[in-house]
Amino acid sequence: MAIEKTDNLLTVFKDLLSQERFGSQSEIVSALQDLGFSNINQSKVSRMLTKFGAIRTRNTRMEMVYCLPNELSVPNTSSPLKNLVLDIDHNDFLIVIKTSPGAAQLIARLLDSVGKTEGILGTIAGDDTIFITPTKGTGIKELINTIQQLFENSL
């Protein structure tokens, strides 16, 4: 039951931050207490803000508020891999895939495992960017279509 309550707290906490209307930790504490989390205090809120990488930024009304930037979220094993891919672009020689931070090496490893049979000669991955080189005789557009199908079907 305690784990269920903690999971619920974390879900509610993230939902509150997504509203982008809380400018102080005390406002977050009050909102959580109003929602029935009586054991919440400023130090717990501070730890949760740190855990989720929350930042203070200006919302659309130019108010300083806490928020959770989605693009900074860390990939986990329950994340569908296609949701980690932000953009696929190319030139005449390479395909470049932009991913969520920290996801590039995971996705590149999967693409390397598919390998030459699907037209991938090799990949180079950083933190959030993958360079893909096609095999000789494989067109860039053809390889992009293959990669997109892989993300839709099996990843």
From Swiss-Prot:
GO terms for molecular function: arginine binding; DNA binding; DNA-binding transcription factor activity. Pathway: Amino-acid biosynthesis; L-arginine biosynthesis [regulation]. Its main location: cytoplasm. It is found in: Cytoplasm. GO terms for biological process: L-arginine biosynthetic process; protein complex oligomerization; regulation of arginine biosynthetic process. It comes from the Bacteria. InterPro entries: Arg_repress, Arg_repress_C, Arg_repress_C_sf, Arg_repress_DNA-bd, WH-like_DNA-bd_sf, WH_DNA-bd_sf. Pfam families: Arg_repressor (PF01316), Arg_repressor_C (PF02863). One of its GO terms (cellular component) is cytoplasm. Keywords: Amino-acid biosynthesis, Arginine biosynthesis, Cytoplasm, DNA-binding, Repressor, Transcription, Transcription regulation. Belongs to the ArgR family. Regulates arginine biosynthesis genes. HAMAP family: Arg_repressor. This is Arginine repressor. It comes from Mannheimia succiniciproducens (strain KCTC 0769BP / MBEL55E). The gene is argR.
